[in-house]
């Protein structure tokens, strides 16, 4: 018998954590963190590190990795991740410790302990685990992200992590078709089961038109963006469309992520385009360079993607008042975020300061997740006998997906703390 327990991510987006227990091995898949409206961390359910045969990290976003170092205080289970994910996770861990105003169950020492236990893997690698096995496949979500195919006690289980079936400028789509169609269970995210993404070509065209129009009118473009994945995708999109007449600046943690990703071209769709994009971009190294960047027209890409902090707030205060400028939000904006406030009200309260924006405000759906139609096609790839467990999704979106697939074995009601048995 194999038990699959949801330690986090059941009926919610984020704090992803799945525990798979067989007769020989217990494998933890991700161990992420969410943050409440006040920035207080919300951790997955507890698991005893000494009981774990292995931990797999799908990618370096905090909602999948942010609680991991807390498991490396008194034990040291092996951690499997791509070398790119491991390096990106390090900067995310350290940034979280630096910026968190709340207690975290780890500090620098636990981060070092975590990284010492990394066993680097690449796409299509298979590792043996006391008679069971783990195979790692491209997830197409962010550079270095993996899906994991577990073969445990004779049962085959696919954990998607966050995945994207569609090709982007940065990445190839998820490698679904290397997975056998008759596996026993798919544990899949359904973050965006609430709708279908627009065609990528149309999205890029509208994004580039917004940038060009702003530049033609003498304005600058501010793009608040996620550090890992989104920043690089937008930079490549600009260079692909030859937007090189004004400087492109990268600020915040994104500039470090850019450098790390450049070391691992094997995880990119077009390494040459990536190198070209970095050549055309300029790093902001501090306040002196920020002031210089504002003297003339420019495109500035910087965290935080929802305007909850970071250098983006600095630029917003200085660029937001000019109608010639544009604020482009290329990511999901949570209802409690300043970015959402700007989209709906034209003003945002950030750090108890109300900021009114006269600049043009755009939102583009540059998602790195699969949409409803893709998720349906993904599920239909598998045999009818394959069980489907939906995680990392709101209850409403999970239900919507299941309604399209009523004949399938979809367990949409599992919440954090519940389990299924095979």
What are these model-predicted stretches?
Residues 208-330, 335, 391-392:
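Hard-cation-handling environments
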Residues 310-316, 367-383:
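A short, acidic, amphipathic alpha-helical segment used as a generic capping/interface helix at domain edges
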Residues 53, 184, 298, 325, ...:
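Conserved acidic residues
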Residues 188-205, 223, 271-274, 357-373:
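Glycine-rich phosphate-binding "P-loop"
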Residues 21-23, 150-153, 174-177, 203, ...:
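Short, solvent-exposed amphipathic alpha-helical segments in soluble enzyme
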Residues 117-123, 278-287, 414:
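Short acidic-hydrophobic, aromatic-tinged amphipathic segments that line or gate anion-handling sites
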Residues 2-12, 16-56, 61, 65, ...:
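His/Asp/Glu-rich metal-coordinating catalytic cores
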Residues 321-356:
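Redox- and metal-dependent alpha/beta enzyme cores, enriched for Fe-S-associated oxidoreductases
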């Amino acid at each position: 018998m194999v038990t699959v327990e949801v330690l986090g991510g059941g009926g919610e987006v984020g704090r992803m954590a799945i525990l798979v227990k067989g007769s020989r091995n217990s494998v933890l898949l991700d161990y992420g963190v969410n943050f409440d409206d006040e920035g207080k961390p919300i951790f997955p359910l507890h698991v005893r590190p000494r009981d774990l045969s292995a931990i797999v990290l799908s990618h370096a976003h905090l909602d999948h990795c942010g609680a991991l170092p807390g498991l490396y205080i008194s034990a040291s289970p092996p951690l499997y991740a791509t070398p790119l994910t491991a390096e990106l996770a390090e900067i995310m861990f350290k940034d979280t410790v630096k910026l968190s105003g709340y207690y975290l169950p780890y500090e620098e020492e636990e981060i070092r302990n975590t990284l010492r236990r990394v066993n680097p893997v690449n796409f299509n690698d298979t590792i043996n685990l006391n008679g069971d096995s783990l195979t790692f496949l491209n997830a197409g979500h962010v550079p270095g992200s993996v899906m994991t195919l577990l073969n445990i006690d004779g049962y085959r289980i696919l954990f998607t992590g966050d995945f994207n079936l569609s090709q982007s400028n940065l990445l190839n789509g998820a490698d679904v078709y290397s997975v056998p169609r008759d596996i026993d269970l798919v544990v899949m995210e359904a973050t965006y089961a609430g709708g279908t993404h627009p065609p990528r070509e149309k999205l890029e065209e509208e994004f580039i038109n917004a940038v060009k129009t702003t530049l033609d009118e003498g304005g600058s473009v501010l793009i608040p963006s996620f550090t890992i994945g989104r920043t690089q995708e937008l930079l490549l999109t600009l260079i692909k469309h030859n937007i090189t007449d004004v400087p492109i600046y990268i600020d915040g943690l994104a500039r470090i992520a850019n450098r790390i990703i450049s070391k691992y071209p094997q995880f990119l769709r077009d390494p040459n385009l990536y190198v070209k994009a970095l050549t055309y971009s300029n790093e902001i190294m501090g306040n002196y360079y920020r002031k210089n960047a504002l003297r003339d027209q420019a495109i500035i890409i910087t965290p935080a993607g929802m305007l909850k902090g970071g250098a983006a707030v600095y630029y917003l205060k200085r660029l937001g008042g000019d109608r010639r400028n544009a604020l482009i939000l290329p990511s999901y904006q949570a209802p409690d975020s300043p970015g959402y406030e700007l989209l709906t009200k034209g003003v945002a309260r950030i750090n108890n300061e109300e900021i009114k924006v006269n600049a043009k405000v755009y939102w583009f759906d540059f998602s790195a997740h699969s949409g409803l139609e893709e998720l349906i096609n993904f599920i239909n790839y598998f045999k009818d006998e394959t069980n489907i467990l939906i995680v990392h999704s709101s209850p409403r979106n999970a239900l919507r997906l299941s309604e399209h697939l009523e004949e399938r074995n979809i367990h949409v009601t599992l919440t954090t703390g519940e389990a299924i048995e095979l």
